Amino acid sequence: MLFPPGIFSEATAFSHKRSIRSISSHSTFDDVTAETDEAPVLAEVEKMPAVVKKVKHGMRKVLESLGILDSKCEQKKKHNKIPSAAAGDSPIKTFGYPFYDTSLGRSLLRPQVGLSFIEGFMQPIKVGAFDWMVQGTVDDVLSFLVCFDDYEAIAEKLGEDGAWHSEGNIGPLYLQLQNTSQYQGDASSILMAYSVEQILGRIDAWGVIDQTIGHWWKPAASLSEKAKSVYDTYQSLKERVPDLTTEKFQEVWNSASTKSGVGKLKELAKLFTLNPETRDLRDSWENLDRVDRGRKISLYVTSYPKRSRTMATFAFGENRVKLGDMAAAVAAATKDTTLDNLLKKYL
């Protein structure tokens, strides 16, 4: 079922046409396909979105009524204990940072330390160099987010000094929703097309882009492996930075290939600071009709949102967000008639 108009559609957004390319970053996935669609333009806000505030107010009662709350997590909280992923408290297993397992020939999700209570501290999710994701049914994802509702997710941005920053004018943390089946895999087999580590690895592997690789920006069967890898990297970055040109990309790639350590990150940071006006915020979901709540979903947490015809996008007004607020945003996005009626009752 596609998302119907509901009681929380408080804001609209303008869209404009962009050329979007859906691309896999690994050779075992589908070849590059070109698509043209509307990409979100996000309008700035300075406080927690009103839609999140409204839904969060009555969300726990609503989810309890629907039988979505995880009993193990709720019991732990009733005894004044803190749920921890490391202790096995998560109601689902498909969450974390994607990595490609060469022995299995597919990508998996690694939780790492985020959402674990370690040495007296609630370890946050951090995104920037990598995206983080959770997958399952809508009920699965809501149950998971509410279980860890007091944990934080922190968006980091790559600064011109080559370091990752979480303080200052960082910008928003973004949520993106997508149906898992878009990638023709099960709930743990989606390979992310983006990570800073992967980009740097390709620069190290191939070195300077020179005349020997020809027109790398024009995909063709005759392209060398190096040219194809350069093209793939450019396309995965362009999904995050729509105004990136081939000339600027090649300039930064070649400069980064001559640097080491932090020097490489300083060069790469130039790509993510292009046209900052394309990263404005907004206070409501954009393009929810692209996602079917009746099927399994992937929820991405990111600093650098992807422009995709298969994704819905939500931006918070800050870079530190509790998972409880994420749950409210997802609940607002994935509502149906039953949820709408319950929200009206409790709000």
From Swiss-Prot:
This protein's superkingdom? Eukaryota
Q: Which UniProt keyword terms apply here?
A: Cytoplasmic vesicle, Secreted
Q: Where in the cell is it found?
A: Cytoplasmic vesicle, Secretory vesicle, Microneme; Secreted
Q: What is its main location?
A: cytoplasm
Q: Does the keyword Secreted apply?
A: yes
Where is it found, in Gene Ontology cellular component terms?
cytoplasmic vesicle; extracellular region; microneme
Q: What protein name applies here? A: Microneme protein 21
- The organism of origin for this protein: Toxoplasma gondii
